[in-house]
Amino acid sequence: MESESVKFGGPRELGGALDLITQYKLLPHHEFFCKRSLPESLSDAHYLHNLVGDTEIRKGEGMQLDQLIPNASLSSRDTNARIQPFVLDELKEAFELNDTAPVELPPAEKGAPTTVSKSKSESKDKDRKHRKHKDKKEKDREHKKHKHKHKDRIKDKDKDKDRDKKKEKSGHHDKKRKNNGTEDADDVQRHKKSKHKSSKLDEMGAM
């Protein structure tokens, strides 16, 4: 009877003592990846050849996991494991897609054609900029108005001060004039009285 280490393909191959394939319901994936034969595009590519050298890759029933590791019989301490970077060109060659032709949908499935227009975000940005510009202009206008008002107020105050000064000066002159006028009237009256007295005396003397 074959021992578990030699036998391959059972559910305990990947999980050791536990049947992880059944436990995690991976049987369809296990069958897809492990039971099907290797595609020719992969088997002929340089990608796998660089990884395993001339070792024949067997996939499916009877495949041993240690066939991918060269000199598996030697212990890992004796071998210097070296990690090699992937060559992207070889990976592209290995996993090249076959269906590279453009896909054409029937007119019924295409739907309505979309017109090339500016995105909403662009139009929103433009609106925001326009609003900001408008707001800035309005603020500048308001600021200028306030400045003019302030200047006008200052001018008005200055004008009022000038008027008050003029009034004070003119009032002072008027008082002088009034005083001068009353003094002149008094003088005239005195002069008249003296004339009147002198004329009366003359009349009396003549009699």
Swiss-Prot record:
Region of interest called Disordered, as start-end residue ranges on this chain: 99-207
InterPro entries in alphabetical order: Mediator_Med19_met
Keyword annotations of the record: Nucleus, Transcription, Transcription regulation
Location relative to the cell: Nucleus
UniProt feature, compositional bias: Basic residues: 127-152, 168-179
GO molecular function ontology, one term from the record: transcription coregulator activity
SS bond list: none
Primary localization: nucleus
Stretches with biased composition (Basic and acidic residues): 153-167
GO cellular component, one term: mediator complex
GO biological process, one term: regulation of transcription by RNA polymerase II
Similarity-based family: Belongs to the plant Mediator complex subunit 19 family.
PANTHER family named among the record's database cross-references: LUNG CANCER METASTASIS-RELATED LCMR1 PROTEIN, MEDIATOR OF RNA POLYMERASE II TRANSCRIPTION SUBUNIT 19
SUBUNIT field: Component of the Mediator complex.
Function: Component of the Mediator complex, a coactivator involved in the regulated transcription of nearly all RNA polymerase II-dependent genes. Mediator functions as a bridge to convey information from gene-specific regulatory proteins to the basal RNA polymerase II transcription machinery. The Mediator complex, having a compact conformation in its free form, is recruited to promoters by direct interactions with regulatory proteins and serves for the assembly of a functional preinitiation complex with RNA polymerase II and the general transcription factors.
Entry protein name: Probable mediator of RNA polymerase II transcription subunit 19b
